[in-house]
């Protein structure tokens, strides 16, 4: 009886844990839908008054209709949001606006000052925002002077948490890890023959989608599972011979960390990624000519497992034949 009671309690605990995982993954979008009817603005604390006005204009601020209080990202706020040491000398110029979109609208990111966001592209921001748990929203980024743009998402985290979203530190870390990986790999390969930033962004979207599907069908993924999903996807997009082995390992490490995240439990995660993929492909001209856009990394993983299983069975049958 005690054993049955223990098993029942364990089952309830597992069910509650699963529900909490899904809730954590969808909480961000719920807050956006309920709170961001009016857009919210987060400005870098290093802006002068003139730069502040210039940035607000770029972001589309309208004082007569945008009545929510402006937020400021200070070094102290940044350290708390990002869980890093407080550095009072930190210069923060990147600013952002976030507003809700209809539930049928895809996630949008627009950089209003592309000449000043030197390292991060709109699609990189979109990929990282999906990892954070954003499904449909419009994010606008601007800066009055050249900056890398890697800290711009911190303003979004700040705004979301100030409005009640529970954003797990692990999800913020993953989004930042992804943003850094994408921007670094892009910068290091920008002028390399065969490299295409659109392919990298779509490949990463497929990798994340493949991880989510594989985890749903298999449960916890091994490092070998994750490595296969990454390597097969990069090969499909003809990036495996373009980016370096070290860069591939950076993507594998990110994918391995993501494979342990609750965000993969979100039912809308793969749909949001597919919307992102279709959006990039539709605007990429001939970048994806002769590329299999229906590639399924999870299916490739299943096929690989079936092949190994068949190979093992063939070996067993071979040795059995000697004993017959």
Language model: regions and residue ranges:
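Second-shell loop/turn segments in exported
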Residues: 39-43, 109-116, 139-146, 190-193, ...
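Sec-dependent N-terminal signal peptides
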Residues: 4-13, 24
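Signal peptide-directed extracytoplasmic domains
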Residues: 79-134
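Acidic/histidine-rich, surface-exposed loop or edge segments in extracytoplasmic proteins
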Residues: 35-41, 101-111, 133-137, 187, ...
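Charged, long alpha-helical assembly modules
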Residues: 1, 231-324
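Extracytoplasmic strand-loop-helix segments at the start of, or within, the mature domains
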Residues: 29-102
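Sec-dependent signal peptide cleavage junction
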Residues: 18-32
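Soluble oligomerization/assembly scaffold segments of membrane-associated complexes
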Residues: 130, 135-241
